[in-house]
């Protein structure tokens, strides 16, 4: 909360996330207070666009799903003057989006940079108060969730990221068994797979509990495959899992992209299969997708807007 991110005093911060989430409470409210910001509360996601025009914020904290929605508005502008588009969507004063809670496609950093908007990615969990790492505007590395905060240190054990420091919880309230599983010798077992490069930048590759173990013993992170396929505009949401011994992808297609490509309902499966085939041609055998399911509704989500896997 006290990390100097070089935000000018009295920056206007529009809070659009649920206040009961640690991410919002820490980074919107406490961070906003510590940096002397003016904190404006968004009263409804349905009125977010109107409130952006009302409050004219400089900074907003979002989850990737929100950023992707705004990215579509920017992409729809085509070759229009970036300054005019930015003024229409955000206002010329807007300069920073802080992103956390899920994977963000790296190419979105380039899209928003075209409009002079920096996306600062971070990583954390409630058990760590919640921020573990963050990106700073003058030190961005695409694909990374930033560098560790000064009060955190990390190690990787069997592919799993473990952290310790002053922000790590003492334990789960009246849950000694769960605490013992998660905290071991002062280290918090995050359950996330990842690595730290030679410059101290943290990269995440998936969740340990989501790993798919193939018949020949290979480990496959479904998030890796999902993130690769989400680069395709026709795929709005995707869930990769093991089903009857093979890797299966369930896809919710993007309706607007279907219209743009002139695809009818009865041709969408064939179009998606072509995308899967294209991915499979480049993927090693153990990471190939052998089954495709198409759904006509969004996946059920958690309160933090992540797809429910189980």
Can you annotate each of these PLM segments?
Residues 148-151, 155-214, 219, 231:
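Conserved ATP-binding/catalytic segment of the ANL
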Residues 1-12, 19-84:
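Conserved AMP-binding/adenylation subdomain of ANL enzymes
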Residues 60-63, 154, 192, 200, ...:
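Residue-level signal for inorganic ion chemistry
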Residues 39-42, 108-158, 167-170, 180-185:
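Conserved ATP-binding loop and adjacent catalytic segment of the adenylate-forming AMP-binding
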Residues 168, 201-230, 256-266, 283-290:
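Adenylate-forming
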Residues 237-240, 244-245, 277-310:
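Conserved C-terminal "lid"/linker of ANL adenylate-forming enzymes
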Residues 193, 231-255:
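C-terminal boundary motif of the adenylate-forming
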Residues 58-62, 70-140, 236:
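Gly/Ser/Thr-rich phosphate-binding loop
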């Amino acid at each position: 909360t006290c990390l100097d991110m070089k935000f000018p005093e009295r920056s206007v911060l529009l809070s659009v996330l649920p206040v009961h989430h640690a991410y919002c409470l820490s980074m919107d409210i406490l961070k906003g207070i510590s940096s002397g910001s003016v904190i404006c509360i968004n009263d409804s996601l349905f009125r977010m666009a109107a409130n952006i025009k009302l409050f004219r914020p400089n900074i907003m904290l979002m989850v990737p799903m929100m950023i992707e929605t705004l990215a579509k508005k920017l992409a729809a502008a085509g070759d229009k003057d970036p300054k005019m588009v930015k003024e229409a969507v955000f206002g010329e004063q807007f300069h920073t989006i802080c992103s956390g809670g899920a994977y963000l496609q790296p190419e979105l950093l380039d899209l928003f940079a075209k409009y002079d908007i920096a996306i600062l990615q971070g990583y954390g969990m409630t058990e760590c108060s919640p921020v573990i790492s963050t990106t700073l505007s003058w030190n961005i590395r695409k694909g990374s969730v930033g560098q560790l905060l000064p009060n955190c240190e990390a190690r990787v054990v069997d592919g799993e990221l473990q952290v310790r420091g002053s922000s790590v919880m003492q334990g789960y309230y009246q849950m000694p068994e769960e605490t013992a599983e998660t905290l071991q010798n002062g280290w918090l077992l995050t359950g996330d797979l990842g690595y730290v490069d030679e410059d101290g930048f943290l990269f995440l590759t998936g969740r340990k509990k989501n790993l798919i173990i193939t018949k020949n013993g290979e480990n496959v992170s479904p998030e890796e495959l999902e993130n690769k396929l989400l680069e395709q505009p026709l795929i709005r949401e995707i869930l990769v899992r093991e089903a009857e011994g093979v890797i299966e992808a369930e896809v919710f297609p993007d309706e607007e992209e279907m219209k743009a490509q002139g695809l009818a309902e009865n041709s969408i499966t064939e179009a998606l299969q072509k995308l899967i085939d294209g991915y499979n041609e480049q993927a090693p055998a153990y990471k190939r997708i052998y089954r495709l399911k198409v759904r006509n509704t969004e996946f059920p989500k958690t309160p933090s807007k992540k797809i429910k896997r189980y």
